[in-house]
Amino acid sequence: MWNLNWYNIWKYSLPKFWEEIPLIFAIVDEYSEKYRAIIDRNRDINLYSLSLAVRRQENGGKGIEFGVMAAKGTDLEEQARWAVVTFLKNIERWERATREGSWKPQYPNRELDYITYLGNRWAPIGASNDPAGLNQYWIPNVQRLYLLYKR
């Protein structure tokens, strides 16, 4: 159903993440129903794998689990909700930008191209809240984890 590589999820995730998976997947399921048209147009983008990859990359503590600053100080559920809705809204933006020519695909693989688009918005290089310059690693790390986690 989820088309995931459970061995890699176990191997490349920390034990603290394992207990979060049911909640994260329930939220993905909930919003997948609400945004069914987006999901249907982009069946190749695995939101389960993407959610786990972003959670692992952000590695945030309580109240900032997904790195969503707009929901800072909340909890895993609220962070996951903001993250999943952000993924879905950015799929729409990516589709529109690609269609209108303001985004030139950078990968032949649509999934990796979308993650690149998302990463430019989610973790922009040179952002004021990234003084150590770690955002430069966000896109390649999320792409790698995404591919490891999906089947």
Model regions and ranges:
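Non-catalytic cell-wall polysaccharide-engagement segments
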Residues: 1-19, 26-31, 70-151
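Poly-acidic low-complexity segments
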Residues: 5-8, 13, 44-47, 62-65
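A short, structure-level motif marking secondary-structure boundaries and short turns
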Residues: 20-23, 35-37
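Conserved interaction-surface patches within small, structured recognition/assembly domains
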Residues: 33-43
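Short, functionally critical alpha-helical segments immediately adjacent to catalytic or ligand/cofactor-binding
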Residues: 41-61, 83
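Short, surface-exposed glycine/acidic/tryptophan-bearing loops
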Residues: 51, 60-79
